[in-house]
Structures are given as C-alpha cells and as structure tokens.
C-alpha cells in the first residue's frame, strides 16, 4: 500500500513562515497561525513541504488504507492561502458571507485575508476543527453564528 506523502515533520513553523518572501502573505500567515492556535489550543506542526497543521486525525478507508493528517491547517501557497478544513465546510451557511474565495476538492483558497471577513473565517476554521473531533453536531459546540 502506498505511503502518505504528507507527514508531520520536526521543522520549525516560524522558520518556514519567515522564509515567505511576499511580506503581505507572510503577515497573513502569521495572523492565520494565531487564529488557529486560539481555536485549537494546540501547537502548530509543519506537515510535508508547505503545510501547517493542528491536531491529529487518524483515518481509515474501506479499502484498508489508513493514515494520519492534521485536523485543520493551512498552507501559504504561491498564488493563494489554502485552508484545509474538515469536510462539510462547503455547505456551511456562513460560506455565503465569507467574501472572495475559491473552493478546491478538500480546501478553501483565498488570495489574502483582506478579501474575506476574518470573523466568518474564524468560525469556519472552528467548525472544521470541531467537526474533525467527532460528535453528532459540530454546530452545537460553536459560539453563535
């Protein structure tokens, strides 16, 4: 069975973010880092080449393939900031209030924080984290939307 490419590393998250050349993207990345620390209460970890993740989620498919990934995370890509949220965020009612964004198969992409409502983004990250933690109704665990 193929091994996961994206694994937790021991690399410094701060060093990685400080290596970002674009000052705006660097500042946004540090702001997102603080948001996710606040939401999760967990330390950030570098995953793979360019992802920052919080928490650990073990998955297993019917095929028998299993692995570990972070519960929520983000990546400061060259063209955009990618957010890795648990499945279900795309249909969250707050998505219509977020602002300028694009959705990928498993991620939410924005160009910069100024393009979105940070309070809404915060709540969507919170939703993703609580959803990945299990439970019947992640909405019930959230502060009011």
Label each region the model flagged.
Residues 1-145:
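Charge-dense, helix-prone N-terminal extensions
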